[in-house]
Amino acid sequence: KKSGVDIEMISAEEARKITPQLSKDIYGALYSPTGGKVNPIKLTLGFARAAKKLGATIQIETEVTGIIMEGNAVKGVHTTKGDYFADTIVNACGSWAAFTAKMVGLDMPIKPRKGQLIVTEPIGHFMDGTLQCARYNVIKFRPETIKDENILRMGASLSIEQTESGGLIIGGTRELVGYDRENSLEAIEAILKRAVRFFPALKDVCIIRAFAGLRPYTPDGLPIIGRVDGLEGFYMAAGHEGDGIALAPITGKLLAEQIVNGKESYSLDPFSPNRFLEAHN
């Protein structure tokens, strides 16, 4: 609320009026009527089309193999399709951002954190919006409060929403297992148990597939955004973990302001990459 988010604590009865399928033994909920959801593929393609209209060139299937430097200033990148020259480079490489940072001698503590998800068969109208159990964010921001080692290891919790086609997307896990993107029966069972705990009606719904992706994890749960002290022209925009799609527009806006104007309209200091460089030094 202090940040201007429209959110309130509601009772269990009020929560079930919004989502009638909820279990009868919940204590209450946090509710944000202005929350929304997007299709990440359509959004990404929309960003790409908008960028092209503004003159951007998008080079796909092109790996950056090194960064061209002149003293402490970046001047371009070496890639598998030749060299590209620019006085400004933004490292927005997600779970692979630490590798790109290493190319300029930076040790950024970004690691891949696997998330496993499940997709159900299409069913009738089941719910509106997105629901997350409290553990979903506790595991991200306050893992020290989790006492069960198995829960902590897999980070199994609940995030659920219904797609336009009627299927449910149910997550998920938060696993620090490197770049492994395989699904595991143990994790799927843990997710399903959590889902049925909050939505008993799901016990008879069929699962049609499962998949996994990687989120860019940081030790303090905050993204790494902004200029890097001592490196002219090098900027970070990574480490958003599971919030990358939601925070992409504001990240791009504020970072563009910092690059072009030297100052952003909302301070990026809490997210500065320099917080980790200072700790490392």
Feature locations, PLM:
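C-terminal lid/capping helical subdomain adjacent to the catalytic/cofactor pocket in oxidative enzymes
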Residues: M9, E14, A56, L222-I224, ...
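Mobile beta-alpha loop/short-helix "lid" or hinge segments that flank ligand
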Residues: A12-K24, H125, T163, L168
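Helical element adjacent to the flavin cofactor pocket in flavoenzyme catalytic cores
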Residues: L30-T88
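Active-site substrate-recognition segment that forms the wall
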Residues: G66-I68, A73, D83-T88, C93-D229
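Active-site catalytic microenvironments for nucleophilic, acid-base chemistry
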Residues: A50-L54, F99, M103, Q258-G262
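Dinucleotide-binding Rossmann-like beta1-alpha1 core, especially the glycine-rich loop
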Residues: K1-E14, I18, S157, A195
